[in-house]
Amino acid sequence: MVVLNQTIERTTLSNLVANEDYCRKVLPFIKSAYFNVKEERIIFEEIHNFVDKYRKIPTKVSLEIEVGQRKDLTENEHLKIVEIIKTLDNANVDMDWLLDTTEKFCKDKAIYNAIVDGISIIDGKDKNRTPDSIPSILTDALAVSFDNAVGHDYLLDSDSRFDFYHRVEE
């Protein structure tokens, strides 16, 4: 039996399948590595694959079918996943709070995973990367943000840019 405690991971999964606006805003920034529980990670992967392929959010039924077609699950894992999927309901939460909390969750998980990766590099368990790669791993983790404004929007910022360019300097 799956414990039905509400965590940010479960709240995120619930809203990914129930709230299309939320899904479109956060899905590009969430990685499967942010989910520690294997069953939740698999559900996220299936949601991500479905949205990539069909450009809309999946139903719980379609998720159950997709999970049922996977060959890498034991019967016990499959049953746990189906049970979790059945609990995914649209929690009535404030959208701003949900976005802020999801962003903090992603930042915290990215930093945690970067530190764990750094430790495995230092311990010699990761043979593909050297200790010189640790700063870039941590930099990438610290850069996790839902803010996708990376410059000027030449149409929306035109008034402020016009004023800036025509300002008389003293």
What spans do the regions from the language model cover?
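Noncatalytic partner-interaction/assembly domains of nucleic-acid and motor enzyme complexes
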Residues: 1-105
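The Walker A/P-loop phosphate-binding site
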Residues: 14, 147-170
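Short amphipathic alpha-helical patches
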Residues: 35-36, 67-71, 121-126, 145-146, ...
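Interdomain "pre-motor" coupling segment immediately N-terminal to P-loop NTPase/helicase cores
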Residues: 89-157
